[in-house]
Regions:
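Internal metal/ion-chelating core segments
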Residues: 149-245
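Alpha-helical repeat scaffolds
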Residues: 9, 38-47, 72-86, 107-119, ...
Length: 247
């Protein structure tokens, strides 16, 4: 039996999936959202298993392009070319437009197009993650900060992934030199869940910016099982070395 999973994640770009496909897609998506190391392999398996599905291809192309490996752009391009336009819905078409610009290397257009998707659906955590991280690569400005302030108003602690929004908004505040607010939001996010590495990253950024070597959540940080995570963990380790350096 087919069912939509968009009501769970507020997505309207996900294909109708059976129970197994729905579980596998959510697993792959969560792997990316939480910086797990197996997101690419899980998305690849989904595409290989059912090439007719569009959402797994959107996820896989995004993961390939997020690697910033120019040698792999052709792989994303081939996936894009394999999609039949008459089989997609309106929001999928918008995502594919984002990916087309991304493949072309036009990150400014990518960010603007993703922002338009978010305006239509401010609870699409996948689009928000893509907006947040691609914005970093083109340079953060007041628009980045303003977008996060507008977004967080549309979320509540009853929403799935609310702590992720807190972590990203914390980073936006930190980059806007408001370290007190950045700390409060990162701490609130980690009080909800210790699973988001980006919330840890935001907290570490605050400490780095203030040259503060006393991480108040050190015990919880030391409990992170790094075996689950991909390259992001190395970036956090780099921040951790700054602690040792300043000590």
């Amino acid at each position: 039996m087919k069912r939509k999973i968009d009501n769970l994640y507020n997505f309207n770009w996900v294909d109708s999936l059976d129970k197994v496909e729905g579980f596998e897609f959510k697993e792959a998506l969560n792997s990316y959202i939480f910086f797990k190391k197996d997101s690419l392999s899980l998305a690849t398996k989904l595409v290989d298993k059912n090439p007719k599905l569009i959402a797994p291809k959107i996820l896989l192309m995004s993961l390939i392009l997020l690697s910033r490996d120019r040698k792999k752009i052709v792989i994303a391009k081939n996936i894009l070319n394999s999609i039949k336009i008459d089989s997609i819905n309106e929001i999928q078409e918008k995502y594919l437009s984002v990916l087309k610009k991304w493949i072309e290397g036009d990150l400014y257009s990518v960010v603007e197009k993703i922002k338009n998707i978010i305006i239509e659906n401010p609870k699409d955590i996948f689009a928000i993650r893509l907006f947040h991280f691609n914005s970093i690569f083109i340079g953060l400005d007041k628009k980045f900060f303003k977008t996060h302030l507008e977004l967080i108003k549309k979320w509540s602690d009853k929403d799935d992934f609310y702590n992720l929004i807190l972590g990203m908004t914390s980073f936006a505040y930190e980059e806007n030199n408001d370290y007190s607010k950045a700390y409060d939001l990162a701490k609130l996010s980690l009080d909800i869940s210790k699973d988001d590495l980006w919330s840890w990253h935001a907290l570490l950024h605050v400490h780095d910016s203030k040259v503060d070597c006393t991480l108040k959540l050190q015990n919880e940080y030391n409990k992170i099982n790094w075996n689950f995570y991909g390259p992001m963990k190395r970036h956090l380790w780099w921040h951790q070395t700054l602690f040792f350096y300043y000590q």
